[in-house]
Amino acid sequence: MHNLPINSYREHEFAAVAAHSVYLNHAGVGPAPTRVVQAVSDAVALTSRDPIGAFISLVMPAMASARARLARLMGVPAEHLAITKNTGHGLSLVADALKLDAGDNIVSVDCEYPSVVYPWYAQADRGIETRLVTPKLDGTFTADDLDAVMDSRTRVVTLSWVQFGTGFRCDLASIAAAAHARNAIFIADVIQGLGALPLNAQELGIDIAVTGVHKWLLAPPGTGGLYVAPHILDRLRLVNMGAGAVVDVMKFDPLDFTVKPTVQRYEEGSPNVLGLVGLEAALSLLEEVGIDAISRQVLALSGYAAEKLDAKGYEVRSPRADYQRAGLVTFRHRSLPNASVLKTLEEANVVGAVRGGNLRFSPHFYNTTEEIDRAVDALPG
């Protein structure tokens, strides 16, 4: 980790986006830092000159380094982390692979992002029921709320670490414990916190963790991560098999279907090389800054935004308690529709979003309080 001031990273890595707009939508898509642009550009140039050589020289180093960095950020062993295409890909793999019987059920919440629940809806033809808990009026929920709908046939509890529409950060450890008390697997989508907040998935008792990389991780879309704890692996069927599933990926004659002994058996074939190169570069930046420093800045900025929105007369919908909040600040005007307010922001060159019936700001570590001031000042009174 380097001790450069935050504004140095802003100047050297985020000058393009900072000059273009007040960008407060990292919960949607993060901007590519300068080093990511350069790394991907160099890789493209190499593939145009020497395709096979580029593939050989780029794939293994980029995958190994990106995997190791992503594993450190997630708090899991690298050997138990597979590289996927995105969050939905990882969750779909797990839903299709998990050994279930007709009458089993899955528990989640009804404010979830579609990728978290749709893979389980698709298991209805196997006789699998999806049970959704409605959060409290403030958008929060607890392990007890989830446990109230669990029973002896509950096999999975699955939800997001941070809710995309409210910004609520759930208590992963207590929910994992509640799931395990029912002999259920706990699956967490960590995309809305990873890169903004510290995480130790293994220590928290998460059995399966999934993520994409195009939000707070500031990497190109099209790559993701899937962690499966080793004691869970034998509960997953072999699905999505390809050449990358086996121990000796270069053994063609005769074929040898000896699958890898970890979740990496689900890495079907040729990976997203340019995405991995970009991911490795993006993660190198986050490691330089340090996740603790990033988290302090993100939480300080989101807290500052909530205070400014209060002062402007807006209804802040995201949680205020430190243990429940993250980098997302959700809010509403007292009378104007969200679409109208968002249009006003766009006209002022402020990039936010509307999700879950709320307006949303999601600043990252390189943003400034001055940018928050500009964004709130641009809001209609």
Residue spans of the language-model regions?
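Pyridoxal 5′-phosphate
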Residues: 1-381
